[in-house]
Curated annotation (Swiss-Prot):
InterPro entries: Class_I_gatase-like, HST_MetA, MetA_family
UniProt organism field: Geobacillus sp. (strain WCH70)
Name of the encoding gene: metAA
Record bears the keyword Ribonucleoprotein: no
Protein name: Homoserine O-acetyltransferase
Swiss-Prot/TrEMBL catalytic activity: L-homoserine + acetyl-CoA = O-acetyl-L-homoserine + CoA
Top-tier EC class: transferase
Active site (catalytic residues): 142, 235, 237
Length: 302
């Protein structure tokens, strides 16, 4: 089934070239079917890239999905045009009255700052509190996961001695959970972060279950027992070249950065990396949409 997007969204042409089933709003409204309403709080600096990456995964499910893009009203983006934000994004006061079947809170390049020092932290906490009553299930990604764990459960983040950067293998801690249906016993996922959460802190919270871990990258996937809050410390949505672009960006800035682990063929940055995580990324999003959003949301919100 298709993902429904605004008619002129730049990601539409890219997705159609990749054979992703997309449908503009005019055609979608003519179908007699209850679509899922998903809101994406996009905190990534390169918003158009993040849009394409997430829509690619949302569009690979058998469910029709309506997407609303949300941005912080208390932060001015320096890397996305004002025209793009005004045309395709809304702000929280305009949607706080609505109910959504699902929400995605993306990562953000602010992980080395204390949460309370982030310019839009107060607004983000208001949104995260709102998800408790107005969203069936919320998927938090990377820094978004750390922010969610901190706000909802008081779990802190810790600086890493070296950036967690590369493609890492993960194992399943719980094999009979719906979110991991169809997963191999070992799967790969990109990580790109300077901070971490500790397993022992999460295990102290009886309302949380650790679903997947990596020997090198640590805790990967955590879920609240009611499925309303999902926390993902990696970036399954990343393109094959995203880590390469981040690596080259940091090199150009003279920042201390190591070659992404298990990423370039033979650790040679001149060779094109392969996407070895795509299938499980798609499976994760399909499982989330089906079992945690579609199966749990009411047909008509009260």
């Amino acid at each position: 089934m298709p993902i429904n997007i605004p008619k002129d969204l730049p990601a539409k042409e890219i997705l159609e070239q990749e054979n992703i089933f997309v449908m503009d709003e005019e055609r979608a409204y003519s179908q007699d079917i209850r679509p899922l309403n998903i809101v994406i709080l996009n905190l990534m600096p390169e918003k158009e890239k993040a849009e394409t990456q997430l829509l690619r995964l949302l569009g690979n499910s058998p469910l029709q999905v309506n997407v609303t893009f949300l941005r912080p009203a208390t932060h001015e983006s320096k890397t996305t045009s004002k025209h793009h934000l005004e045309q395709f994004y809304t702000i929280f006061p305009h949607i706080r009255h609505r109910k959504f079947d699902g929400m995605i809170i993306t990562g953000a390049p602010v992980e080395q700052m204390p949460f309370e020092k982030v310019t839009y932290w107060s607004e983000l906490t208001e949104i995260m509190e709102w998800t408790k009553t107005n969203v069936t299930s919320t998927l938090h990604i990377c820094w978004g996961a750390q922010a969610g764990l901190y706000y909802h459960y008081g779990i802190p983040k810790y600086p890493l001695p070296q950036k967690c950067f590369g493609i890492f293998e993960h194992s399943l801690e719980v094999k009979n959970v719906k979110l991991l249906r169809g997963f191999d016993d070992v799967f790969r996922m990109p990580h790109s972060r300077h901070t971490d959460v500790k397993r022992e802190d999460i295990e102290k919270i009886p309302e949380l279950t650790i679903l997947s871990v990596s020997e090198k990258a640590g805790v990967c996937l955590v879920a609240s027992n009611d499925g309303k809050q999902i926390f993902l410390t990696g970036h399954p949505e990343y393109d094959a070249t995203t880590l390469k672009e981040e690596y080259e960006r940091d090199l150009a800035k003279g920042l201390p950065i190591h070659i992404p682990e298990s990423y370039f063929p033979n650790d040679d940055p001149t060779k094109e990396p392969l996407n070895t995580w795509r299938s499980h990324a798609n499976l994760l999003f399909v499982n989330w949409l089906n079992y945690y959003v579609y199966q749990e949301t009411p047909y008509e919100w009260e």
